[in-house]
Amino acid sequence: MMPRLQEKYEKEVVSALMDKFGYKNIMEVPKLEKIVINMGVGEAKENQKALEAAVEDLAKITGQKPILTKAKKSVANFKIRENMPLGCKVTLRKQNMYEFADKLINVALPRVRDFSGVSSKSFDGRGNYAIGIKEQLIFPEIEFDKIDKIRGMDIIFVTTAKTDEEARELLRFLGMPFAR
């Protein structure tokens, strides 16, 4: 079965974007390529259990096993050595990506306290969008009494759009609640 958001993209968003930007070919229309969710766990250098808990949380949220991210080089001031695991990340594509985007837009973001929309300034100039989340509790899979610590995460939407304007419209049509 096709995810709800993918169906919406194919049925409504493609034609809306073609009208708005005047694309000649359907293959020119920007689409979501992947979503990368990254959790940096600073205290992992002293406490490996913290990293395991973060990996478990991220696996619950995304339904996919995260890979560990390691330090590129040693930094004495931060007390880190090269190849020391310091976080975890998941790359979602295809169906999993649409399922996650749907859950983020329609379930998780509305649960954020004092939520007034996501910033429309977090585009990188190449049509990718980044959003930071302060706590993992906004996702329904995380049980409040089972977590050891509140952790945040970065979520990056990678699109095939050439410009930020095209990417913004793509995400807006998919339902991303941008702040006015």
From Swiss-Prot:
GO cellular component, one term: ribosome
GO molecular function: rRNA binding; structural constituent of ribosome; tRNA binding
GO BP term, pick one: translation
Signal peptide: none
Function: This is one of the proteins that bind and probably mediate the attachment of the 5S RNA into the large ribosomal subunit, where it forms part of the central protuberance. In the 70S ribosome it contacts protein S13 of the 30S subunit (bridge B1b), connecting the 2 subunits; this bridge is implicated in subunit movement. Contacts the P site tRNA; the 5S rRNA and some of its associated proteins might help stabilize positioning of ribosome-bound tRNAs.
Subunit annotation: Part of the 50S ribosomal subunit; part of the 5S rRNA/L5/L18/L25 subcomplex. Contacts the 5S rRNA and the P site tRNA. Forms a bridge to the 30S subunit in the 70S ribosome.
SUPFAM superfamilies: RL5-like
Organism expressing this protein natively: Clostridium botulinum (strain Loch Maree / Type A3)
Family, similarity comment: Belongs to the universal ribosomal protein uL5 family.
UniProt-recorded name of the protein: Large ribosomal subunit protein uL5
Keywords: Ribonucleoprotein, Ribosomal protein, RNA-binding, rRNA-binding, tRNA-binding
Gene3D superfamilies: 3.30.1440.10
Entry's transmembrane regions: none
Xref: Pfam families: Ribosomal_L5, Ribosomal_L5_C
Mitochondrion found in the keyword field: no
Gene that this polypeptide is encoded by: rplE
NCBIfam families: PRK00010.1
